[in-house]
Every structure is written in structure tokens, then in C-alpha cells.
Regions:
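Active-site PLP attachment segment
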Residues: 172-208, 231-234
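Conserved active-site segment immediately N-terminal to the catalytic lysine
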Residues: 155-189, 216-221
Length: 369
């Protein structure tokens, strides 16, 4: 057994010859950006694959978050989770809004609907939950609260590509959902992202906002930005869409092996599949109980690293611990006990389509032995 580096993720790459052939067509057309044919085709193909009405492509996964808040004219306070990647909360801050942190449900890692109402004030205008690790939020519980108080709901669905609940896309929940197509994700366009909306009017507004606010050659209808996806990455995305199902199934098989081996290891827990959910196996987080396992999370993380097996403490530290946000009242430790416990115990194991049986076994040997 060799000692090659096992990475926590690996990008899904289209066949290079196939991609080169598409690049040749783009070169010949000389249309490399600005809503070209590949861009249009990818939006249509993604809407069909994801079972959603409208898709708007972006150049990365952060800009859809920023633009969604603009599109819905969100002001004041936005309720969100501290247990996420920093882009979630940064998008709120960049829009001049105040993030209000609410604790998570330890059973899922997602925003706990039972704790949302207590955080609502007269300045609250929206809720921004995250489908953490691609595990669906309690969308009904969240929507019931949003409807009661007249709040908008924007889902950060960066991890939730292709996830369904009882045959329905999780991306259809809320007012808007956003996706990341970063190289680390299940489906990628190198860098990229998308926004999912439910009606043509919102789709049109989003498309204006991501193109400087232009509604025509000489008409600007609002203060937009430039966040369009180019033709090269659109072509790359179309090719990757053809192989993403096989990649997800390969991840599924890795998850099965991890669960079989780790289920009897005292002090190590993990999430099982949720009933009725079509998962995408974006990540495989484990949680270390130091007292039962006999080793802290950080000690296990270091042991793995020494063996050339890279895990990721994802999400540690909490967003609420960063200097920009730690002074917020809602960032207080006593307000977020479940989130702190999860952040202090998590390691995401290597999880991607290219892991071999030997890679999986080396990873497990670090933990089981």
C-alpha cells in the first residue's frame, strides 16, 4: 500500500478531447461571453436536470447570494446559521444587512426552525438557511415561520446540487436558492454558480442585475454588477452534466463503505441517509467524542494528515467566531451551543468520485486503528 496523498476532494473533469472540441467551436464563433449559445443551453439543461423552472448562471457561487439579497430588496436583519462557509454571512454583510445567528439542529447540522421565532425582531426581513452537507433543511418549518412574519427565504444550496425530497427538488423551496459550481463541488464548472427562481419576472430581474443592470442596448434599469458565466465554462458544465450521475453514485459507494466500517467504532458518529431523500453525498462528516474515542478531533486530524490522508474541519471555527462577527449579540457562545459542539468535533473525510478502495481503506485505517 503506497503513501500517496489522499485529498478530501477532487474535481470532476470532462474528457479533455471532448472539451477541446467544444473550445474549437467557441474559438471559431468568436463569441466567448455575454449570453452565448453554450450559456443558454446550460441554463436550459440544468433546469431540466434539477427539476426547477428557471436557472440563472453566475461566474461563482458567492455572487448569487449577494444578488439574491439585492433582487429581493432585503434590508435590516437576516436570520442565518453560524455553521456554514463564510460566504453565506459575508453576502448579508456586504449588502449592508445585519446577520443574526440562530443555533442548529444537532440531528442535521441545519438551522433549527424551533429557535428562529425568538430571533425575529421588527427589523427582520429574511431568513438565509443552508442545506449543510447537502442535507435538506426543514423547509416546511422554516416556510411556516416566514409566512407568519412576512419574511423572504433565500436558501444557500451550495452543497445541494440534485438533492430531492420525495421526488421534489429541494431547490424549489423558499423564494430563491443559490448553487455553487466550484471545483470542490459534486458538479463543477471550475468556478461558477447559479440561482434558482420560480417565476419569469424574477429571472428577468436577476439577469439584469448580473449584467450591469442592462435591460437593452441603451437601457439600464438598476445598479447591476458583472457576474455572468462565460462560454468556456458553460461548455465545460454541459460536458460535466453528462457524467455527474455516475460521479454521485461513486460517492454513494464510498459512503456505504465508510458507514459499514465506522458504525461500531465507539466515539465516532456520522449522518445516515434521510428517509425519502435523494442525496448527492457531497461530504462525509464524522464527529469525534474525545472521551469515548480516546482521542480529540484535532489529534485524529493530525494523525490523518501525518498519514497523507487529508480531512477537513468543515465548519470550524464557526462564522460567529471570526472577528467581523464575534461582537454581534447573536454570536454569543451560549446562544449557539449545538453549533459549537458540532464545529469542535467534526472532520470531513475524503469524499469524491475518484477514491479507490485502497484510498478508502487507508482513510479508515487512520480512524479504526
Amino acid at each position: 500500500m503506497d503513501n500517496k496523498l489522499i485529498t478530501v476532494t477532487s474535481p470532476l473533469l470532462p474528457n479533455l478531447d471532448d472539451f477541446t472540441a467544444e473550445l474549437k467551436k467557441i474559438w471559431d464563433s468568436k463569441w466567448i461571453t455575454n449570453n452565448g449559445s453554450y450559456h443558454k443551453e446550460l441554463e436550459k439543461a440544468l433546469a431540466e436536470y434539477l427539476k426547477v423552472p428557471y436557472v440563472s448562471l453566475f461566474t461563482n457561487g458567492t455572487l448569487p447570494l449577494l444578488t439574491a439579497l439585492q433582487a429581493l430588496r432585503i434590508t435590516g436583519e437576516v436570520i442565518t446559521t453560524p455553521y456554514s462557509f463564510v460566504a453565506t454571512t459575508h453576502s448579508i454583510w456586504w449588502n449592508g444587512c445585519k446577520p443574526v445567528f440562530v443555533d442548529i439542529d444537532p440531528a442535521t447540522g441545519n438551522l433549527d426552525p424551533s429557535k428562529i421565532e425568538a430571533a425575529i425582531t421588527p427589523r427582520t426581513t429574511a431568513i438565509m438557511p443552508v442545506h449543510v452537507y447537502g442535507k435538506p433543511c426543514d423547509t416546511k418549518g422554516i416556510q411556516d415561520i416566514a409566512d407568519k412574519y412576512g419574511l423572504k427565504v433565500i436558501y444557500d444550496a451550495a452543497h445541494a446540487f440534485g438533492v430531492e425530497v420525495n421526488g421534489e427538488s429541494i431547490l424549489n423551496a423558499g423564494d430563491i436558492s443559490t448553487l455553487s459550481f466550484h471545483a470542490t463541488k459534486v458538479y463543477n464548472t471550475i468556478e461558477g454558480g447559479a440561482m434558482i427562481m420560480h417565476d419569469e419576472k424574477t429571472k428577468q430581474r436577476i439577469d439584469y442585475l448580473k449584467n450591469f443592470g442592462f435591460a437593452g442596448e441603451t437601457t439600464v434599469v438598476g445598479p447591476g454588477i458583472n457576474s455572468k458565466m462565460d462560454e468556456m465554462r458553460s461548455a465545460y458544465g454541459l460536458l460535466n452534466l453528462k457524467q455527474v450521475d455516475a460521479a454521485i453514485e461513486a460517492r454513494h459507494q464510498v459512503a456505504i463503505k465508510y458507514r459499514e466500517a465506522l458504525r461500531q467504532v465507539e466515539g465516532i458518529t456520522f449522518f445516515d441517509d434521510m428517509p425519502g431523500v435523494k442525496h448527492n453525498y457531497s461530504y462525509f462528516p464524522i464527529f469525534v467524542d474525545a472521551e469515548k474515542y480516546g482521542m480529540t478531533r484535532d489529534e485524529l486530524y493530525a494523525k490523518m494528515k501525518a498519514a497523507n490522508v487529508l480531512g477537513r474541519r468543515y465548519f470550524y471555527p464557526l462564522i460567529s467566531e471570526f472577528s467581523t462577527y464575534r461582537g454581534l449579540e447573536s454570536a454569543a457562545l451560549e446562544n449557539l451551543p449545538n453549533a459549537h459542539k458540532m464545529a469542535d468535533s467534526v472532520i470531513c473525510l475524503p469524499m469524491h468520485h475518484a477514491l479507490s478502495d485502497e484510498d478508502v481503506q487507508r482513510t479508515l485505517d487512520c480512524i479504526v486503528k
